[in-house]
Amino acid sequence: MKKFISISICTLYSVFCTLLMAQSLLTPEQLAKRERHKNLTVKEWNTDEKTQTRWLDRIKVYDNQGRCVEEIEYATYGQKWRVTSKYDDKTGKVIEEVEYNDRNRATRIKKYEWNENGTKAKQYNYLPNGKLFSIKVYEYIFSDK
C-alpha cells in the first residue's frame, strides 16, 4: 500500500512540475490572451468602397485552451490558403503546421522542435508526400549593447 501511494504522489508531482514548467514558459500577457481566446472564432470582413460589397477576409479558430488551431485567408473568389496547427499537450507549443492552397490541398507540412527555454530549435519542412524538403535551424544571439 505504501509503494502505491508513493508512486501516486511521485506521479502527481511529476505532472504538476511539467504543467508548472509549461505555464512558466508563457508570459502573463500570453496567458491572458489565451484565456480570452478560448473556444473563439474570429471572422474578419472587408468592404469594397465603391460597391459596398462585403466579403470574408480571414477566419481564426481557437481551441479550448486559447490556441489558434486553424487560420483561413480568403479573397473575393474564395479561399486563398489555410493553415492548421497541432500542439504538444505538455508544453503547449506548436509541433506541427499544415499549409493548404486555394484548392484545400496540403502544400507543406512543418514540424517543430523546441529548446528547453521555450524558443524554437528546428523547423522541418515536408512535402505533402512526406518527403523532407528542408530544415531550418534557429540561432539566438544576444549582444551586450
Predicted stretch roles:
Residues M1-F4:
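Positively charged n-region of N-terminal signal peptides that target proteins for export
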Residues S6-I7, K120:
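Short amphipathic alpha-helical "recognition" segments used for binding
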Residues Q23-K145:
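Buried hydrophobic residues that stabilize the cores of well-folded domains
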Residues S8-T18:
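Bacterial N-terminal signal peptides
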